Swiss-Prot record:
This is SsrA-binding protein. HAMAP family: SmpB (MF_00023). It comes from Bordetella pertussis (strain Tohama I / ATCC BAA-589 / NCTC 13251). InterPro entries: SmpB, SsrA-bd_prot, SsrA-bd_prot_CS. Required for rescue of stalled ribosomes mediated by trans-translation. Binds to transfer-messenger RNA (tmRNA), required for stable association of tmRNA with ribosomes. tmRNA and SmpB together mimic tRNA shape, replacing the anticodon stem-loop with SmpB. tmRNA is encoded by the ssrA gene; the 2 termini fold to resemble tRNA(Ala) and it encodes a 'tag peptide', a short internal open reading frame. During trans-translation Ala-aminoacylated tmRNA acts like a tRNA, entering the A-site of stalled ribosomes, displacing the stalled mRNA. GO terms for cellular component: cytosol. The keyword RNA-binding applies. Keywords: Cytoplasm, RNA-binding. It holds the Pfam family SmpB. Belongs to the SmpB family. It is found in: Cytoplasm. CDD domains: SmpB.
Amino acid sequence: MSIIDNRKATHDYFIEDRYEAGMVLEGWEVKAIRDGRVQLKESYVIVRDGEIYLLGMHVSPLPTASTHIRPDATRTRKLLLKAEEIRKLIGKVEQRGYTLVPLNLHYKNGRIKLDFALGRGKKLYDKRDTAREKDWQREKERVLKHDTRVNQRDS
């Protein structure tokens, strides 16, 4: 079950490989995420010291958050992957033009997981081509739907 999607990711990047990772979260973060108080829009994934981290994910603390800690809404969160996957990702990210983009947060067996992808940034003309292609597909479906209705009415 998806908690939140980063719809901007497919608009701004060509998605190549998808990965799923666990996250190191604090108790107040889990409660806030379950309440839907999370945003992935400006977040990104980085590789630092052989480990992978999620930066910029905003988790708004609940008003009933613990009083003995100070919630940091945009703290850096470590992603949990197998060592082999991390090595493979480091090799791919070091290639020019590739980056790691968070796609969505979801539950898996009661745990909160992050789907992220290896992506290449789209240029402005790529975004226009993608939009043009989507419009064309929509138009084709509309015309086909209209034609089938006309044919059914005639017979």
